[in-house]
């Protein structure tokens, strides 16, 4: 069956967007607020009509992720911030496979996300309450699956409990995108053997943003 590279590229951009937001939060203590909202909201919507609907129905909501994906696909550098982004992205993919292999963890994740949806009726998505709840899901359900993702950044920034919660909530969004990526036919071999196809598709989507 032919792969739908539009959906695959969107989901992959979702993973990359989370990786870029985590990097920005860890080094600078801040990140693009619209991209963060899109990524965090994707965790809540468990019954989307389409892949694009997971990310708010707008390709522009994944602009940072698409740019990050293109940078990763087209760089030969294995050093510095680029290598960091690649490590975060691949680590999220590995954790998703661990999650998929654990029926108990998947069930727990589903229940905890349902609880999140109920909390969203009373709190804003970016509120400390929701951030802490999302971070708690990552710590309780995803981290024990291992291997843990080592986040690099400014020690002063990473000491902040609020930043720690945002980073973990954003990693949870990355897991959500990685689950979606597998669901629409994504796989790590594509990063080696379908780079040109992914690059072309990402450029086409970016042109619409």
From Swiss-Prot:
InterPro entries cross-referenced by the UniProt entry: HflD (IPR007451), HflD-like_sf (IPR035932)
Disulfide bonds: none
Membrane topology: Peripheral membrane protein
GO cellular component, one term: cytoplasm
One Pfam family hit: DUF489
Keywords linked to the UniProt accession: Cell inner membrane, Cell membrane, Coiled coil, Cytoplasm, Membrane
Coiled-coil annotated residue ranges, if any: 95-132
Entry annotated with the keyword Cell division: no
Cell location: Cytoplasm; Cell inner membrane
Record keyword tRNA-binding present: no
Family of this protein: Belongs to the HflD family.
PANTHER family (UniProt xref): HIGH FREQUENCY LYSOGENIZATION PROTEIN HFLD
NCBIfam families per record: PRK00218.1-1 (NF001245), PRK00218.1-2 (NF001246), PRK00218.1-4 (NF001248), PRK00218.1-5 (NF001249)
Official protein name in the record: High frequency lysogenization protein HflD homolog
Organism: Cronobacter sakazakii (strain ATCC BAA-894)
Lineage of source species: Bacteria, Pseudomonadati, Pseudomonadota, Gammaproteobacteria, Enterobacterales
